[in-house]
């Protein structure tokens, strides 16, 4: 038998361009957008339905996206615990949104565009079809300019709570325009009606915070403290500081007043990037999955741009945080990232989704920030990872 040998340049061509010359990111790929589209994957969110199905979503941002006039969000469903996913819906006019179940119904809450109105939609069939938020009785709940991210809703004291940021300020500059605030509604109210929702006052940017190094607070989490008070815990953008901080804003029982003491900044690993905090009633600890800055990466760039590691962290008091276990890591931080993690408990496991930047069959991602994948991950038996 004779063997025919291909010229070396053809071997190189087939290896590099056959679609097999790159390694897919870890986890299960839910969706992918090539950088050639000039659309990037943002705002990953996940929810576990009462029947055990998973629903996930992401939006699109970037030069060729519709983020500034009527943003697009895609909905996906998995009925096999995240092994496979099917796209079930595309929502026109939905951005920066989280998914949640309330009284057996599935909701998505965010804005209609970049710095848009706050809108909410309901699905009664597990994410296949959704209501349209076209007026104040059908999901257009707060008009104006607002900012948010896939952060949690919390039910407490007969109300459902969600942190957002007012995005009209003295400055139109990113970060400086954001004011911390909370919205809430009675648990038995019609969440699609604007009249059901109460807004707190908004707390604006203050250049004197953190000895003048404060540049923004954003992407707040509604969190119930150990002693039963509602707080808005926010990501802090302070790129000229070596440490990462969160801010803790106090919310009154009726949801109408937000207040802040300039001493209420606390060191928190990963808090210069978006995070989601949830309480685990079994361990009696608050948990989050955050972008830690690993040894050797300190000072390579501003803290908010280092997103190549995901770690489980815990706290008993929301003031002191401990890194428990690294879950994901890539040695490169410029073109690789696992970011904007949203997560849920599922029995003994944590399930989470990531806005992931990694190479694909078109080469590298546009940047670590401009992600080309949404990926699904599972932390098995997560309580064994937590120190006691």
Predicted regions and their residues:
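Bacterial Sec-dependent N-terminal signal peptides
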Residues: 1-23
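Beta-rich carbohydrate-recognition and catalytic domains
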Residues: 20-43, 47-95, 100-149, 154-219, ...
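Alpha-helical scaffolding within the catalytic cores
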Residues: 273-274
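Short glycine-rich, acidic/polar surface loops and turns
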Residues: 338-341
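Short alpha-helix at the nucleotide-sugar/activated-sugar donor binding site of glycosyltransferases
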Residues: 344
